[in-house]
């Protein structure tokens, strides 16, 4: 199995943080369990400097995981591999043989371009959120994916969080009644736009980078259709720092269920939380129904750590946590699961040789999809949140007017 990872930033390797990210630890755990005989991970970065920093992270992660490379084949390659050499993911796509799949973790505005080229090379592709920024681009990718009989997923890991699965179970069982409103508060530390994403933060906004998770979640829980959206944003702190993007955005989305019941989702998102906040993300969701309520504080997971060496911490052991097992490190959580299930699905699909058969077609998509976790987000489903983002961005540019969602 040969995996191409496009992007080597914070979420991939933990570059710029004291962690190892989520994508590479997920790949480690996948290979630890499966012990695939021929296994290679190819990292494609933007420049040699970033690759060198990420390479140190990757090699250290392998070391502390105590994977015995003499018993488990685990080859890693990095491009560009020489200073002043302009090797890109395009060169790898063109020249590398027998790639199994691609994981795309690049800045938001590059998603369409990179995913499109992966599909051009017949690669099953997992992309981090958001899927695309424009609905027309989402449609093009869906059409190409279906025409080529390959598979595409978007890594909306909030669907795998047991907090949210409990909400879905309660909703599906009709214990909460008909939906009236969803209220979401979601924010991250200033370090994210100011340092970690400084080179491209001005090309995105907090709604499409972060808030989109909970747009997708409302669709996942209710299977409702978004009807219209209104968005209001504030530019203050980040603009003074020379980053021309919104500090905070408030968004109201009107949804309609299959039984024509309308309800609203209110999103309040920002990425200017103090850097000494007790967690990277502050996140709360409240569902109000005609028969009951559901509340989830997804920052306060019931754990608080205080020590002389660090400030107060409230870790989230459910997302992606490094645990010590004897003398080795293992990573567990729904963030890990969202990626390992994609890799497991690709492996099963490859073994079934779906691409070279007539098995995959529109009418049998559910059969094809069974090789993935039911929480997985297909390109088709991810296009729902893309449509909301596109309308919300139009609202921000048009005096916060209501915008119909196509």
Question: PLM features: residue spans?
Answer:
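Glycine- and charged-residue-rich phosphate/anionic-cofactor binding loop of Rossmann-like
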Residues: 352-384, 404
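Short, well-ordered coil/turn segments that N-cap beta-strands
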Residues: 123, 150-151, 178-180, 261-265
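Predominantly a Rossmann-like dinucleotide-binding segment in NAD(P)-dependent oxidoreductases
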Residues: 9, 153, 158-244, 251, ...
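Short, well-ordered amphipathic alpha-helices
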Residues: 22-32, 55-60, 165-171, 251-254, ...
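Active-site loop of classical SDR/Rossmann-like NAD(P)-dependent oxidoreductases
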Residues: 49-54, 329-340, 357-360, 380-384
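Beta-strand-loop-alpha-helix segment that lines the small-molecule cofactor/substrate pocket
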Residues: 101, 107-159
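Contiguous beta-strand/loop segments that form the cofactor/metal-binding neighborhood of enzyme cores
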Residues: 209-310, 325-352, 364-369, 389-393, ...
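N-terminal glycine-/serine-/threonine-rich beta1-alpha1-beta2 phosphate-ribose binding loop
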Residues: 1-121
């Amino acid at each position: 199995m040969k995996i191409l990872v496009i992007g080597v930033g914070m979420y991939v390797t933990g570059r710029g943080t004291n962690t190892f990210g989520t994508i590479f630890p997920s790949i480690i755990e996948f290979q630890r369990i499966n012990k695939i005989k021929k296994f290679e991970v190819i990292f494609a970065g933007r420049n040699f400097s970033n690759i060198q920093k990420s390479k140190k992270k990757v090699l250290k992660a392998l070391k502390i995981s105590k994977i015995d490379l003499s018993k488990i084949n685990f080859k890693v390659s990095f491009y560009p591999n020489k200073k002043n050499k302009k090797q890109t993911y395009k060169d790898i796509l063109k020249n590398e043989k027998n790639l199994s799949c691609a994981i795309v973790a690049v800045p938001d505005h590059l998603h369409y371009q990179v995913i499109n080229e992966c599909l051009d090379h017949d690669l099953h592709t997992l992309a981090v959120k958001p899927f695309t920024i424009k609905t027309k681009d989402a449609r093009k990718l869906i059409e190409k994916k279906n025409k080529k009989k390959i598979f595409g997923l978007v890594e909306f890991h909030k669907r795998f969080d047991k907090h949210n699965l409990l909400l879905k179970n309660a909703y599906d069982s009709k214990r909460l009644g008909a939906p009236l409103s969803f209220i979401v508060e979601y924010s991250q530390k200033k370090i994210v736009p100011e340092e970690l994403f400084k080179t491209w933060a001005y090309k995105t906004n907090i709604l499409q980078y972060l808030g989109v998770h909970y747009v997708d979640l409302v669709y996942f829980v209710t299977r409702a259709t978004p009807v219209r959206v209104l968005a209001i944003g504030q530019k203050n702190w980040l603009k003074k720092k020379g980053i021309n993007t919104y500090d905070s955005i408030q968004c109201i989305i009107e949804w309609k269920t299959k039984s024509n019941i309308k309800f609203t989702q209110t999103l309040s998102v920002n990425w200017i939380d103090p850097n000494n906040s007790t967690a990277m993300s502050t996140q709360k969701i409240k569902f109000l129904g005609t028969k009951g309520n559901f509340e989830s504080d997804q920052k306060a997971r019931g754990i608080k750590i205080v020590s002389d060496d660090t400030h107060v911490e409230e870790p989230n052991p459910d997302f992606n946590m490094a645990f010590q097992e004897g003398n080795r490190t293992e990573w567990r959580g729904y963030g890990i699961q969202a990626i390992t299930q994609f890799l497991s699905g690709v492996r099963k699909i490859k073994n079934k040789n779906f691409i070279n058969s007539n098995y995959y077609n529109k009418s049998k998509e559910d059969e094809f999809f069974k090789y993935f976790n039911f929480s997985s987000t297909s390109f088709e489903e991810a296009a729902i949140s893309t449509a909301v983002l596109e309308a919300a961005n139009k609202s921000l540019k048009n005096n916060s007017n209501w915008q119909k969602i196509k």
